[in-house]
Design a protein with these regions (language model features):
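Short aromatic/basic micro-patch
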Residues: 246
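N-terminal leader/linker segments that precede catalytic domains of diphosphate-processing enzymes
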Residues: 1-163, 170-187, 192-235, 241, ...
Length: 295
């Protein structure tokens, strides 16, 4: 997955110079990272779990009892040493390296692999550690065509405030599966009843490696479709979303193609939806399908 992302990073550099528009710009923007690039590999035991900047690596020299440096980067042994990672992250947060989110995430070398440690969500981009999330396409069949529920992110959100979002989306916290996370987030974000949430169908995975202001985001998105009854109306429960609107899917298609109204990674999940719904076809669909493939 990350080798593919590095290849797309080269295209992203070229696209930036040309001022590329349309759907491809979203895919390339989310795959602008070159790995390891100027970063150092971060390992737990013998497994590469992340990539850190030279600045963060210097800060980590304050924990020689846990962190070891060699020609290949830096590493932390498993067991009690890996368990110390959460405390190290908290100290770094207090020193201003990143914002503490008070939500633990599992640390894995690859999706589906064993949990090697846990670390606060706020530290993930700083360490370049893989994060997993869920995104739900809340779809409605109406006489005039397919519609999609669209949420607007709250203005106080640190990440992409006021942008448009899915009806349900969120990170997979430590100890939960994507399906369990979907049910949890569905209730919290949209008042989605459990009896509806269980009908969601997983339709794929999308991975990317992206350099952003907060650091290196290596994300794997678990994508779901849920066909909702016409009489269901989502309502915000946790102040993360301020309102929901039901849009014709064609309107969503045009907004993604022509604007930056949606949160950066939501665009990728929607592009996949447009392909599956036949709104993007031909060579463009094939290019996008291959670029989005997380395998």
């Amino acid at each position: 997955m990350w080798h593919r992302a590095c290849g797309l990073a080269k295209r992203a550099d070229a696209a930036q110079g040309r001022g590329m528009h349309g759907f491809r710009r979203h895919v390339l923007a989310c795959n602008n990272a070159r790995l390891p690039g100027r970063r150092l590999t971060f390992r737990i035991g013998g497994d590469v779990v992340g990539y850190v900047t030279a600045e963060l690596a210097r800060a980590l020299t304050f924990w020689p009892q846990h962190i070891h440096f060699d020609g290949g980067g830096l590493s932390i042994r498993g067991g009690r040493h890996a368990a110390a990672l959460q405390g190290i992250a908290q100290d770094l947060s207090e020193r201003g390296y990143f914002r503490w989110r008070d939500e633990a995430f599992d640390v894995r070398a690859h999706p589906g692999g064993p949990v090697l440690a846990r670390i606060d969500r706020g530290a993930l981009p700083a360490f370049g550690i893989l994060a997993e999330g869920v995104h739900l396409n809340g779809l409605v069949r109406r006489a005039e065509g397919v519609h999609l529920w669209v949420g607007r992110r709250a203005p106080h959100k640190t990440l992409d405030p006021d942008k448009l979002d899915h009806i349900v989306a969120g990170g997979v916290p430590a100890g939960l599966t994507p399906v369990e996370t979907l049910a949890k987030e569905g209730d919290e974000e949209a008042g989605l009843p459990a009896e509806l949430a269980v009908r969601a169908e997983k339709v794929g995975e999308i991975g990317y490696a992206m350099e952003r202001e907060e650091g290196l985001r290596r994300d794997l998105l678990h994508c779901f479709d849920l066909w909702l009854p016409e009489d269901f109306t989502p309502h915000p429960n946790d102040h993360e979303v301020v309102a929901f609107e039901l849009w014709p899917l064609a309107r969503v298609h045009d907004a993604v193609r022509d604007t930056d109204m949606f949160k950066f990674n939501v665009n990728l999940v929607l592009i996949d939806l447009f392909i599956r719904q036949g709104l993007i076809v031909g060579t463009e669909a094939e290019w996008l399908r291959q670029a989005l493939n997380a395998e």
